[in-house]
């Protein structure tokens, strides 16, 4: 399997995080569903490591079969970010949580104590954005019936 990652910061992060989790292995039968599952896994790894705007459409594969052989060479391509209304590609931005604040509704009062809210918040200041932590926070808040978000 070959990798064509056009963003050096993601390439470095992938080398540290991802090789331990590789699902696609040399000698596996070619399967489009497995390639799509790999795209989703890589997307999950990156959105849990600061890349808020990353989605699976940045990842594509090319498959090259050798005539007479029963082998397929796979290349994974990870493209740069293209902002809306732009023709220029840029590097993907990695986001870090700056601060976590709780604000009340129309009257400005919080429906619960800050301690209760903090105990149910998985997002932490100074850590990279993590979509799993965001979902866990939403789920925890959903169980607190006094909260609407």
State where each predicted segment sits.
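Interaction-mediating elements
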Residues: 1-144, 148-149
């Amino acid at each position: 399997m070959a990798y064509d990652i056009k963003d050096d910061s993601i390439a470095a992060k992938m080398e540290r995080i991802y090789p331990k989790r590789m699902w696609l292995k040399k000698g596996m039968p070619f399967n489009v569903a497995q390639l799509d599952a790999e795209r989703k896994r890589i997307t999950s790894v990156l959105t849990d490591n600061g890349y808020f705007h990353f989605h699976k459409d940045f990842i594509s594969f090319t498959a090259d079969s050798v005539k007479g052989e029963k082998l397929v060479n796979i290349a994974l391509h990870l493209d740069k970010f293209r902002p809306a209304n732009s023709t220029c590609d840029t590097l993907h931005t990695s986001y870090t949580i700056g601060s976590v604040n709780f604000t009340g509704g129309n009257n400005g009062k919080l429906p619960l104590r800050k301690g209760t809210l903090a105990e149910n918040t998985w997002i932490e200041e100074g850590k990279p954005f993590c979509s799993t932590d965001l979902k866990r926070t939403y789920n925890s808040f959903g169980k607190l019936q006094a909260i609407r978000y």
